From Swiss-Prot:
Gene Ontology CC, one term: cytosol
Chief place where the protein resides: cytoplasm
Cofactor: binding details: Binds 2 magnesium ions per subunit.
GO process annotations (BP): fructose 1,6-bisphosphate metabolic process; fructose 6-phosphate metabolic process; fructose metabolic process; gluconeogenesis; sucrose biosynthetic process
Originating species: Helicobacter pylori (strain HPAG1)
Official protein name in the record: Fructose-1,6-bisphosphatase class 1
Length: 290
């Protein structure tokens, strides 16, 4: 893989993790392709969800590999109650081993989300993030100074493009139970569809955000507090912001940056809006004051 795009203080750890992922893609594919990979276990993870077999197998594989990196001090999976910590190292990893596992049996796009933190698990300490999506193609998205898209081919990740969101998109991925949507959100969505926006919600957050990114604009929303800050929300928020979009939530009707949220507990959840600038403006107009 060509690492010429990665510069700055945190470039080396990003390169190390990508190199690790590049070597591990085939093993991950094997895990996902097993006939019973989508079968539910009888366990319950720290977030109260029932993991599928592929969740646990990928988690074990990733944890072992992340801990093998000398500069990693702590590794934290959403499947675990607390982080696994070493004596040495500078960086901390929080990851969702298999985002979208609930739709895997339908053969929808799933992925691994990774946040790289420094010193402590806080939004302000998130220095880079990335995800890998598994479908008929395998792609990697990396946020450091900018956002870079890669495709896996012949055992390597190949650079495709630098992602920059346009001011306005044409797709909407609105997750959650619509009967619980606020009046403001319902009006915003009605306005988008009146402008011929297309609904592109799959039930896999990483897939839906990936769609917004490769289409260069649009909006992903999940207004209920269901998504985990450290493992899903913060890493994808960083990618959206580095792509010149906006990542936010509403606190008593006031729009605020997701990456300025505090974290009171490891598995704390948040509402989440990820959008290009025009869609962010429309959402604020309708949800302000609610």
């Amino acid at each position: 893989m060509d690492y010429k795009h990665f510069k700055g203080k945190h470039a080396n750890i990003v390169i190390e993790i990508i190199s690790l992922l590049e070597k591990g893609v085939k093993k991950a594919q094997e895990i996902l392709e097993k006939p019973d990979a989508g079968s539910y276990t009888k366990l319950e993870n720290s977030s109260g969800d029932t993991p599928i077999k592929a969740d646990l197998a990928l988690d074990k594989f990733l944890e072992e590999n992340f801990l093998s990196l000398e500069n990693i001090k702590s590794v934290f999976s959403e499947e675990k109650e607390t982080p696994v910590t070493k004596e040495n190292g500078s960086y901390l990893i929080a990851y969702d081993p298999l985002d979208g596992s609930s739709v895997m049996e339908a053969n929808f796009l799933v992925g691994t989300i990774i946040g790289i933190y420094e010193k402590d698990y806080k939004a302000q300490n998130l220095v880079a993030s990335l995800y890998v999506v598994f479908g008929h193609k395998i792609e990697l998205m990396v946020a450091l100074e900018e956002v870079y898209r890669y495709a896996f081919y012949q055992n390597k990740f190949h650079f495709i493009e630098t992602i920059v969101l346009e001011n306005k998109g044409k797709i909407v991925a609105s997750g959650g139970n619509q009967k619980d949507f606020s009046l403001g959100l319902k009006k915003a969505l009605e306005g988008f569809f009146a402008e011929n926006y297309r609904l592109r919600y799959s039930g896999s957050m990483v897939a839906d955000v990936h769609h917004v990114l490769i289409k260069k604009g649009g909006m992903f929303s999940y207004p209920q507090k269901k998504l985990r800050k450290l493992f899903e929300v913060f890493p994808l928020a960083l990618i959206i912001e580095k792509a010149k979009g906006e990542a936010f939530y509403f606190d008593k009707g006031v729009k605020k940056r997701l990456l300025e949220q505090s974290v009171e507990s490891y598995h704390e959840k948040s509402e989440c809006y990820l959008a290009s600038p025009h869609e962010a403006q429309i959402l604020e107009k309708h949800l302000k004051g609610e």
